[in-house]
Amino acid sequence: MRRGGWRKRAGEGDGWGGWGGYMSAKVKKLEDQFRSDSAIQHQRDGNSSSIFSGVAIYVNGFTDPSADELRRLMMLHGGQYHVYYSRSKTTHIIATNLPNAKIKELKGEKVVRPEWIVESIKAGRLLSHIPYQLYTKQSSVQKGLSFNSICKPEDAMPGPSNIAKDLNRVNHIKQCEMESEITPNGISSWNEEEEEDSDGLGFTKLDQILPERKQNGIQSHKDSTAIFNGHTHNTCISALKTQDCLVPSSNSVASRFSPGPVQEEGKPEKGIVDFRDCTMQQLQQSNKNTDFSWNPHRTMSNSSSSSSLHSNTKINGAHHSTVQGPSSTKSTSVPTPSKAASLSVSKPSDCSFISDFYSRSRLHHISTWKCELTEFVNSLQRKNSGVFPGREKLKKWKAGRSALKTDTGNVSVASSAKPQSCIMHVDMDCFFVSVAIRNRPDLKGKPVAVTSNRGAGKAPLRPGANPQLEWQYYQNKLLNGKAEIRIPDKLDSLVWEHSDSAHMNGVDCDLTVLSMAEIASCSYEARQAGIKNGMFFGQAKKLCPNLQAVSYDFNAYKEVAQTVYEILASYTHNIEAVSCDEALVDITEILTETRLTPDELANAIRDEIKAQTKCTASVGMGSNILLARMATRKAKPDGQYHLKPEEVDDFIRGQLVTNLPGVGRSMESKLASLGIRTCGDLQCASMSKLQKEFGPKTGQMLYRFCRGLDDRPVRTEKERKSVSAEINYGIRFTQPKEAEAFLLSLSEEIQRRLEAAGMKGKRLTLKIMVRKAGAPVEPAKYGGHGICDNIARTVTLDHATDSAKVIGKETLNMFHTMKLNISDMRGVGIQVQQLVPISKTTSAQSAVQSGRLPGGSHSVIDLLHVQKAKKCSEEEHKEVFVAAMDLEISSDSRTCTVLPSRGTHLTAGLNSNVSKTDSAVKLNGLHSPISVKSRLNLSIEVPSASQLDKSVLEALPPDLREQVEQIYTIQQGETYGDSKREPINGCNTALLSQPVGTVLLQVPELQEPNANMGINVIALPAFSQVDPEVFAALPAELQAELKDAYDQRQKQPEQQPANAFVSKNPCLQLKHATTKNKKKIRKKNPVSPVKKIQSPLKNKLLGSPAKNMPAASGSPQKLIDGFLKQEGAAAQLEAVPSTSDASDPSALQTEQCGSFRPQAPNLAGAVEFNDVKTLLKEWITTISDPMEEDILQVVKYCTDLIEEKDLEKLDLVVKYMKRLMQSSVESVWNMAFDFILDNVQVVLQQTYGSTLKVI
């Protein structure tokens, strides 16, 4: 059919208006849609501009930002976005790469990079597109004419262009200067007239361009030029160019702009990490007569009268006391350069430096208090007597009130109903400030901040410091994401040195900067003035001149925190210590027992906290942790809010996504690009879309959290993963010896912390912060680290240690390999990981190191003989199966099965002196690298408790000992009356399946030692199987004995042929199953072995003769396959001929037994499919509104089926639920099914790479 034929046949009256009418209508529809979306976008963002008025773009190919983001930007700033290219209407083509054919086709068109749009928005006006052209005819050696473009006054938009008129770009970008002088460092100067013409529009009105960028309200600087270390330079610093530095900062970005504040001191309250809280407003000052200034260190008070030093005096002389008015009796000061030499400051080389630093570090105190409070809660739970004084008071109060209401016949129905699960979130209001002013009535109701500086907020500019360039570096780093910004080395001598000049362009400058002492906490009155936690004190003083500063009082903070937790502990011990001023409490049990409402309980707790501490607390309550935390936001300050289940949907829809845990700046930006700003918007996105954008786990988390679903429990105990000590404040070394001495001192600090935690560590990490090449020698913050590179080295020790000598030695070795410039070191840290409790290793290690092993033996051979004498004479050998499975298939990557000997009877008894908390990884001196903490699955079959030697059990390493004790605990619940499960030869016939890659390890019975040899050499394992950690822990004489034994065995001739190795050689041996056998087994057994064991349908067929034929081959893989075929077949095994040889395969088959059978997947106890169907039908038909706990239980049952590879039953269950739930009249059941199905599909996708087809 020729082109256009169908159109002619359609006729002119079809509504399209002739040829091309369809596309014209489509394009018009897209334009109308763009205009309508623009209006919606303007209402949502709250601002707009006309920067791109008259500009119509067409995006060709992949761009960064994406086409959707560029479309959104054009909506906001007055441009047009064309889905289809039009030569007559499209003004600019946006692309990052084009093929040669496209280049020729678009010859003469304006093809520019997407940076043109982004940087035009940053500049606040339409920039010239020429520097951003994707391709140009100008050769690389051809020079261009540097004419300055002329901008009309009406082109300038309110925004950064009125402050820094234009910024030089690396690629010779020529922009409008508007008579402003471009300084060498790229920051434009401006005069008083220009600012008056702009009607005072500066950084304070940047929110007109980006509405969500909250500003602190500082007026722009007037009548000054930017100080470049006090003097001018002739070289433009391209690595730290500033055209991106003047972008309006959001609240989150602004709170993190600091050119390297101290990590331990420079964070806001409750330990929130804010390393770069240097906002753009800190580049300005409201007074036009004040020169551009920064504060790289603490300031000195103008008052000359000084008082005694406060207990919180900071190291390096950064915190001194002077009298400063009635509201601040102490002040932080930093000496001027002329006085610095005369002041005694603490140095890292001083022996008391580390202790002084941590004694005055706020964040160190906060983290330490959290550990102490967590241990306090744990100790209460261990010593729980069941008596709660607070709860008893509530009962009495409730009884009295009920008696009064009974007289009037007005009993509360809500209090008599059984409450559902309820979590309470207790958060103190402005904790540091509240504690500081509780005895200061003169400060109540006034703007107050807790900080180390109480002066005027200014300090002298130190030589060598360059705050502007540090600010530019952090600004660019945040704006460009993780992109590394290169700082040329050659700038060292040109830019960073020679800061003695106090002139710039011939103008004298006041070398004072704003104080960079950070505010740890501020009152709500101060927050109303724009001050926030983490802001620099100098900037805060500009915002609020009446701001009153108070000093730290760590003893008072600790006292109040302990009081708060004691109050909570008087009601319940189900407490999770979040911080010194924050806690999560499970109050379900309290509400059930006292019959109070959540509001009544919260009110009682808040009143008691206020009465005892004189500080207020806010309380949020909800059915889970997420809702409780969100309710607290609404309750603050000094209030309480109970988010009821029926209010959750309406409440959470209006919440910003930034209020959800785990959503930071990066994720917020990505969600915004998808048009998602609130939880209501997020609910419209499917789980598949979220998982595609953010990954399976994060996508599922967002999907659940935006609906108010959170199954995280209140955790009272948290396993400690590491112990560390890091310092990045005041670190300055001049000689290698100083650094080495400091590392040794830090190792001693690590030892103290390990001993306090009762831990030993096996993995050491050394972290060093080194000044970045080209960065200022002196950072903007006094004593801070500045712009640095982070270097780390890690080593794994042979055995866990808490010795400062061992840690120091290994640390020095790693330090020497780094080959660093000592003078550039700015931070040092040591971290210890792979922790093991000291109490769990002391008994075994002390016995080994002293040469006295359990049972009074003095060597490994004696230990083995002692064990043999204590066991039954029928015991002939042990076998250990270590099965390794690919880690990519499952996290349960290894399975270790220890089979008991012949004649060992399994019982359910467990000796009372066996501790549940112990763990181990060794067996009779044989080391296994498998650790419970690495989440490996260990299944161990052990002898009965009556046959167990206590001394041997105590000598076992912690991980293996814990596994043995866990199996004994499981055996307590098992019964052995069933004849089908009667032990054979003292062994239970159940055996876990052995996965691919099985290795057979024989531990034969020890022969009597040969008198001529003096030691049984054959009983030793192969030298390659000896664990270095075990060997290193032996005493010196025992090591020598073992070395002699190995040397002696090497001299003995081989007496056994290779083919008789299995049956006659009693030495330890490893046999690997062949790939051929694996393939055959897989073909014969398409059903998973695990499912074969655990399926309840298969349990009835265990006695079938067809399934109990003995294995005819002696190979390990066939032997294991034979075990799987003979579960419970006692009669068949009796008919199998066996030899007297202990290593004969048929004889071994009678001993392959297990005492542990994992529980089959069940739904509330229902295992069979018919039972599950009945339970599901009853659940769906009798309940109109399903509970979250029930839905999660169904999800767990389905995921258990996936783990058991019972996909057939899973398919039936899902389809049955779909029929029932979709036939229900209640729409909530449809939502419940979608939620269940989404979770099941996620697990299936992760496990099998595919999903379930539900029709």
Curated annotation (Swiss-Prot):
Composition skew (Polar residues), residue ranges:
287-300, 313-325, 1137-1153
Could you cite one Gene Ontology molecular function of this protein? damaged DNA binding
Q: Return the CDD domains for the record.
A: BRCT_Rev1, PolY_Rev1, Rev1_C, Rev1_UBM2
Q: Which residues form the signal peptide?
A: none
Residue positions annotated to bind dCTP are: 362, 427-431, 521-527, 533, 581
Residue ranges annotated for the UmuC domain, each copy included: 423-664
Tell me the ranges covered by the BRCT domain, including all copies: 47-134
**Which residue stretches belong to region Protein interaction domain?**
1156-1255
Which segments carry the region annotation Interaction with target DNA?
357-367, 664-667, 720-728
Broad class of enzyme this protein falls into: transferase
Q: Which residues bind Mg(2+) 2?
A: 427
Listed GO biological process terms: double-strand break repair; error-free translesion synthesis; error-prone translesion synthesis; gene conversion of immunoglobulin genes
Q: Where does Mg(2+) bind?
A: 427, 581
Compartments reported by the entry: Nucleus
Q: Where is this site: Interaction with target DNA?
A: 781, 794
Q: Which SMART domains match?
A: BRCT
- Entry annotated with the keyword Signal: no
The residues that the entry says bind Mg(2+) 1 are 427, 581-582
What keywords tag this UniProt record?
Answer: DNA damage, DNA repair, DNA synthesis, DNA-binding, Magnesium, Metal-binding, Nucleotidyltransferase, Nucleus, Transferase
Q: Which PANTHER family match?
A: DNA REPAIR PROTEIN REV1
Query: Which family does this protein fall into?
Result: Belongs to the DNA polymerase type-Y family.
Q: Give the protein's biological function.
A: Deoxycytidyl transferase involved in DNA repair. Transfers a dCMP residue from dCTP to the 3'-end of a DNA primer in a template-dependent reaction. May assist in the first step in the bypass of abasic lesions by the insertion of a nucleotide opposite the lesion. Required for normal induction of mutations by physical and chemical agents. May play a role in homologous recombination and immunoglobulin gene conversion.
| Free-text note on domains in this protein's UniProt record | The C-terminal domain is necessary for protein interactions.
Name the record gives this protein: DNA repair protein REV1
Per the UniProt record, the source organism is Gallus gallus (Chicken)
